Swiss-Prot record:
It is found in: Cell membrane. Residues 1-81, 137-170, 225-245, 386-678 are cytoplasmic. Keywords: Calmodulin-binding, cAMP, cAMP-binding, Cell membrane, cGMP, cGMP-binding, Ion channel, Ion transport, Ligand-gated ion channel, Membrane, Nucleotide-binding, Transmembrane, Transmembrane helix, Transport. GO terms for biological process: response to bacterium; response to calcium ion. The lineage of its organism: Eukaryota, Viridiplantae, Streptophyta, Embryophyta, Tracheophyta. It comes from Arabidopsis thaliana. This is Putative cyclic nucleotide-gated ion channel 15. PROSITE patterns: CNMP_BINDING_3, IQ.
């Protein structure tokens, strides 16, 4: 099997290829799939004839210079979607041929020539896609059934085998679907038939269109399955999937409406023929063709006959059944756009109501048509509701899961009798987590992906954020990638305490969005309070870094020297203690002085100690200055008074110095992290 960086392609032996020569001979092929001639024999010095390459893996097909297409390739995927649209257009166009017969007020039937020309052009264009599908299938490889390897299998690229397999499977169905039968019939065959052209047109259209419509309709289902197998779905979005299923339902209404129109025309003509049989002395069937309007015999008969009056549903002369509405509303003689939408509405109405409002006559064909409407409506309506529910639920499924989980949480809090403030905090956290993640479990999603893809996604999400942390801005990309892999998202609502002073620190947080308040009382010391604001790009929990850098690892986690509280909604990435140990081992590769300086500068613990140290030094400086000024004044007084004053000054010095030393002793210097190389 070939790989991305390889210059050669290894192909599996094809059991279906006829081998020439004796066994044990190795055949070599170029990268384009051609055979290297003059292959040396092992011992006999003979030569083999060229061996035809017949199988290849999918990823190697692009390297082989061949016109065979990969059934799982991007080209076939795009063509399948285009052909699916062409099939749907064809299924929409074919029933429109049923609207060709048009009835006129002169009790005659004609053919709509303009509609006939338009439908012929559109149908011919749709037939071209079916012909293209046949040609593409002859050039599309297939998976050899006995050669499946890790669920993929080898592609058979021998054109003769592909053609043989296609001819013995679905070729004939595609051929029947691609034949331009309606065009040939209405333009060539029907005009040359004996008998009534209108009768021939109606009968031929009814049988030929249905005969060719069935295979065209069944081609959609394997094509949809093939698209789903290749891409996972027919449509990329839920609304498109719902529209696709609704379109199939409308297509069924369109077909039923067209059939109802053609049957209504036949029922109207049957009434005329029945009346003509009564008036058989002066009436002939050929009078019902509009090309006979100028016939004197027809004109005299039409003036004498009352056929236009008796062939109406209200006269009770003939049973029109479910087609009486078409005669009463003069649909059969209306313009095409008007009768089409009326028939579409009739089909949709009766398909949705399962034909409950249909009042049929005693004709067996009419009753059978009503049964088909009821059965088809029941099946399609169930499929439509089920499929649309499946597609639409995909957009609201996570929201519904969150609502169920929230209901369970409310029941649990009520069962445990949590106080109102805790309940409100839980509700607030759930709401914020939903708004931030939309119910997607990011960790589970990332874990299911391959390592390389997971690393790239983590890099995209976290790399720039980690780079903004001053502690990491000097690290190389490999080390930053290692950190990004181990970062986990964390969410905090307003008022949440991330860590309290004196509690063990089990994670280090890097802030993405939001602000936190970090303060300390130096272990509860009276009168001592230090506070600072932590924002995006800052971090907290640096005590864990000192613990992780300790060359002598300790199981006990360090205690926090500060209390960190979220003052608004906060998004952050967390490094757990065990992950930080790995990151800490990478820190030792950096320059010690540079990293120590950055760590001290950005650590709030070190900032607090430095502020107290500077404050104590400033106080000592002021005391020394005050002592010098006081000593200069006392030189002008008597020695006794100077000695007394000097003694008083020294006593006050010791008292105040004791206070400064007590302050410094209470603020312990933070432990220095070990950045030395091991």
């Amino acid at each position: 099997m070939g790989y991305g960086n390889s210059r050669s392609v290894r192909f599996q032996e094809d059991q279906e290829v006829v081998h020439g020569g004796e066994s044990g001979v190795k055949l070599k092929f170029k990268i384009n799939g051609t055979q290297i001639n003059n292959v040396k024999m092992m011992s006999k010095g003979k030569f083999l004839k060229a061996k035809v390459l017949s199988r290849v893996f999918s990823e190697d097909l692009e390297r082989v210079k061949t016109k065979i297409l990969d059934p799982r390739g991007q080209t076939i995927r795009r063509w399948n979607k285009i052909f699916l649209i062409a099939c749907l257009v064809s299924l929409f166009v074919d029933p429109l041929f049923f609207f060709l017969p048009v009835m006129r007020n002169e009790a005659c039937i004609t053919i709509g020539v303009r509609l006939e020309v338009v439908l012929t052009l559109i149908r011919s264009l749709a037939d071209a896609f079916y012909i293209a599908q046949i040609l593409i299938r002859f050039r599309t490889a297939y998976i050899a059934p006995p050669s499946r390897v890790f669920g993929r299998g080898e592609l058979v690229i021998d054109s003769r085998k592909i053609a043989w397999r296609y001819l013995h499977k679905s070729f004939w169905i595609h051929l029947v679907a691609a034949l331009p039968l309606p065009q040939v019939l209405i333009w060539i065959i029907i005009p040359n038939l004996r008998g009534s052209p209108m009768t021939n047109t109606k009968n031929v259209l009814r049988f030929i269109i249905i005969f060719q419509y069935v295979p065209r309709m069944f081609l959609i289902f394997p094509l949809s399955r093939q698209i789903i197998k290749a891409t996972g779905v027919v449509t990329e979005t839920a609304w498109a999937g719902a529209a696709y299923n609704l379109m199939l339902y409308m297509l069924a209404s369109h077909v039923l409406g067209a059939c109802w129109y053609l049957l209504a025309v036949e029922r109207q003509e049957a009434c005329w023929r029945h009346a003509c049989n009564i008036e058989k002395q002066i009436c002939q069937y050929r009078f019902f063709e509009c090309r006979r309007l100028e016939d004197p015999q027809r004109n005299s008969w039409f003036e004498w006959s009352n056929i236009t009056t008796i062939c109406k549903p209200a006269s009770k002369f003939y049973e029109f059944g479910i087609f009486g509405d078409a005669v009463t509303s003069t649909v059969t003689s209306s313009k095409f756009i008007n009768k089409y939408f009326y028939c579409l509405w009739w089909g949709l109405k009766n398909l949705s109501s399962l034909g409950q409002n249909l009042a049929t006559s005693t004709y067996a064909g009419e009753i059978l048509f009503a049964i088909i409407i009821a059965t088809l409506g029941l099946v399609l309506f169930a499929l439509l509701i089920g499929n649309m529910q499946t597609y639409l639920q995909s957009t609201t499924m996570r929201l519904e899961e969150w609502r169920i989980r929230r209901t369970d949480t409310e029941q649990w809090m009520h069962h445990r009798q949590l106080p109102p403030e805790l309940r409100q905090a839980v509700r607030k956290y759930d709401q914020y987590k939903w708004l931030a993640t939309r119910g997607v479990d990011e960790e589970a999603l990332l874990i299911s992906l391959p390592l390389d893809l997971r690393r790239d996604i983590k890099r995209h999400l976290c790399f720039d954020l980690v780079r903004r942390v001053p502690l990491f801005d000097q690290m190389d990309e490999r080390m930053l990638d290692a950190i990004c892999e181990r970062l986990k998202p964390a969410l905090c609502t307003e008022g949440t305490f991330l860590v309290r002073e004196g509690d063990p620190v089990n994670e280090m947080l890097f802030i993405i969005r939001g602000h936190l308040d970090s303060y300390t009382t130096n272990g509860g010391r009276t009168g001592f309070f230090n506070s600072c604001l932590i924002g995006p790009g800052d971090f907290c929990g640096e005590e864990l870094l000192t613990w992780a850098l300790d060359p002598r690892p300790v199981v006990i986690l360090p205690s926090s020297t500060r209390t960190v509280k979220a003052i608004c909604e906060v998004e952050a990435f967390a490094l757990k203690a065990e992950d930080l140990q790995f990151v800490a081992s990478q820190f030792r590769r950096l320059h010690t002085k540079q990293l120590r300086h950055k760590f001290r500068f950005y650590s709030h613990q070190w900032r607090t100690w430095a502020a107290c140290f500077i404050q104590a030094a400033w106080r000592r400086h002021r005391k020394r200055k005050y002592k010098t000024e006081l000593r200069a004044k006392e030189e002008f007084h008597y020695r006794f008074e100077a000695a007394t004053a000097r003694l008083a000054v020294n006593g006050g010095k010791y008292t105040r110095s004791g206070s400064d030393s007590g302050m410094m002793s209470s603020i312990q210097k933070p432990v220095e992290p070990d950045f030395s190389s091991e």
